Amino acid sequence: MEYFIYNIENLTDAEYEKWFSLMTEDKQEKVSRYKSLTRRKCSVAGEMLVKNHIGRALNLAPESLIILADENGKPYMENCRTKFNISHCENILVYAFSNEEIGIDIEKIKPISLKVLKSFFSENEQEYVSGNVLNADNPESYNSPEILERFYRIYTLKEAICKKSGIGIKGLKDADALPFLDQSFKENDYIISIIK
């Protein structure tokens, strides 16, 4: 398993235009509908980086490779044993490769809402995040650095589990993240989780 981190600010206009033009017509339409330039750049950069990596590994021209998506949006390449997954948050893109199914997610550590915690986390996950110090009367208690890091570890693990399995975020509530805490790490102000 390998993973990479890429800042899309490094994507030149020429690279963006070249790789956008090499996307399928459907993908070009999808990317063009994104209102955010950052999101458009992440989509194009993700495709460029994955194709370059797999192209080098298979000794194929990256431009000849086509990334498809299954019914749940999970990316894949036909006739390719290498599995990959991509995620982005703001200007940071992460992508991972493996010989097995893989899921990756990244989130920037920022204040949270208890509503998300209660809606998508099991009781055990809520207890792990809170460390039994959450105080409903004191909203600041759930935005301490330790609580936030725990929250984003669980959240990104749940997303990575769902992405690996291909079920999408509809399985977020049922994904059990606690057994995979060692597959999550902090990188600057971000939490990254990789499930293989």
Model region roles, listed by residue range:
Residues 1-196:
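Core catalytic alpha/beta fold that binds nucleotide/phospho-ligands
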